[in-house]
Amino acid sequence: MEIRWGEGKLARLPALADELVRLKVDVIVAVTSPAVLAARQATRTIPIVMPLSSDPVADGLVASLARPGGNITGLSVMSSELGQKRLQLLKESFPRLSRPVAVLWNPDYVGMAARYRQAQGGASSVGIGVRSVEVRDSRDLERELESMDHERPDALLILADPLTTSQRLRIVEFAAAARLPAMYERSGFVEAGGLMSYGPNVDQIVRRAAIYVDKILKGARPGDLPIEQPETFELVINLKSAKAQDIVIPQSILLQADKVIE
């Protein structure tokens, strides 16, 4: 097995993908959407399996979810109801929300625009507003967090990408210090001290990617393997963090939780 890591630097991905192609690997597993793009640019023949793509059709990676075509297949973490459900859980947990929820996201990251639009649509359905907070690097993040001290939202929704994931401790610490309820896409943020997350189990999805690799190594063509979307989602709540922030999570929400960190 050959492992290549871009160290969070997207500019490194094309060279790393080219290197794997020169090694004539049998399959490339590209974890993020930018990595998939780099791998596709490097080869149209070596099979590529993507465990955590956002919207591979909208991103131009595959022709359709049912029949991807080409040399790419795998799994998507997108689901049409996710944006609405996350905001619905926020509203049910904090019914006094009146100001727009600040959505922290990176518009330069592949697939993120679709996830922000999903949040916008979900907000309309739930009956609350959202405010776009765009962060492209750590300097943007610090500036926007500081601005929230002056233009305070009622809650946060954090969209996960390499930037927000690498800065999750900073984001979690800010939300705790400001006593801002925050919803995250990934449970790793909650395990780091965040309040709550709702989304697919990433560990399970990555394990599913291994099944795709196995099928391809046994002769299946990637273009014939449908893209899987998550069917089950987990609500994770950090009750320890809630108590530290003097936040009371309604019992009705706690009963829905798949995991409670105490």
Predicted regions and their residues:
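Short hydrophobic alpha-helices and adjacent helix-cap/hinge residues
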Residues: 1-262
